[in-house]
């Protein structure tokens, strides 16, 4: 399985200069807007706190908002800034790939504890997603009735039963707690983004769940640039 949680990072700072003098009736409140790119989030936040920048226009990780001290001299606006996703490789070419089986891909939904991710990893700053349309999407209501029929929730026992049934039907055997196909352990290559603590944690958690099921998981770590090369 190859994994990539897609979220391109662009850090932009907006600096606004207020006109101190009179202006025409149809004039603007500013005479200049500067956009400055910061690659270091810590530097950008300190610049805002010190009054050198008026706005930091990008998401802030939840661990930086845990207490009143971290919010000091900051006014935080909540918005939908992106999402975390897990991509499964469905190819049936090459070595045996359990994710080429639709029912196995379906079962993975029950190995993901979305509430844990939202509450623990994101500090409550998020909502669980069960499709490519989130609850804030205008299209969400169109697919809501379909999503509800799947009853996706964290249920590893159900996932294991589905996966075991499908693998057994393909001739795989579980030997000493490890799934084997044609006398070879079934291996999964899992690419995990290590340049983001949330993505890294999600990858580690799901890897453990897959190992509990009986797969041999080879974890490969890397940043977004490596993901583009390795995954795509």
Give the predicted meaning of each segment.
Residues 5, 20-40, 67-82, 174-176:
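Aromatic-rich, solvent-exposed beta-strand/loop patch
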Residues 81-107, 111, 120-121, 193:
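A bilobed periplasmic-binding-protein/Venus flytrap-type ligand-binding module shared by bacterial periplasmic
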Residues 128-174, 194-200:
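Structural transition elements
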Residues 25-31, 102, 156, 160-189:
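Immediate post-signal peptide segment of exported/extracytoplasmic ligand-binding proteins
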Residues 44-45, 95, 104-105, 226-231:
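Short, hydrophobic alpha-helical packing/hinge segments within bilobed ligand-binding/sensory domains
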Residues 9-18:
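Bacterial N-terminal signal peptides
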Residues 30-37, 44, 55, 185-193, ...:
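Short, well-ordered beta-strand elements
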């Amino acid at each position: 399985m190859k994994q990539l949680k897609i979220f391109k990072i662009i850090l932009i700072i907006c600096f606004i200069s207020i006109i101190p003098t009179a202006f025409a009736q149809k004039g603007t409140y500013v005479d200049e807007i500067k956009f400055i790119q910061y690659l270091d989030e810590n530097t950008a936040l300190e610049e805002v706190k010190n009054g050198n920048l008026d706005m930091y226009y990008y998401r802030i990780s939840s661990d930086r908002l845990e207490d009143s001290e971290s919010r000091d001299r900051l006014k935080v606006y909540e918005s939908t800034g992106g999402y975390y996703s897990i991509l499964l490789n469905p190819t049936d070419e090459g070595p045996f790939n359990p994710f080429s089986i639709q029912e196995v891909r379906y079962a993975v939904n029950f190995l993901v504890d979305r509430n844990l991710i939202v509450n623990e990893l994101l500090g409550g700053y998020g909502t669980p997603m069960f499709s490519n349309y989130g609850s804030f999407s205008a299209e969400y209501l169109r697919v809501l009735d379909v999503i509800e029929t799947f009853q996706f929730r964290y249920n590893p026992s159900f996932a294991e039963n589905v996966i075991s049934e499908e693998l057994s039907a393909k001739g795989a055997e579980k030997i000493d707690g490890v799934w084997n196909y044609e006398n070879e352990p079934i291996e999964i290559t899992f690419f995990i983004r290590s340049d983001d603590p949330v993505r890294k944690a999600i990858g580690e958690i799901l890897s453990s769940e897959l190992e509990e099921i009986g797969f041999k998981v080879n974890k490969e770590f890397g940043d977004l640039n490596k993901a583009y090369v390795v995954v795509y």
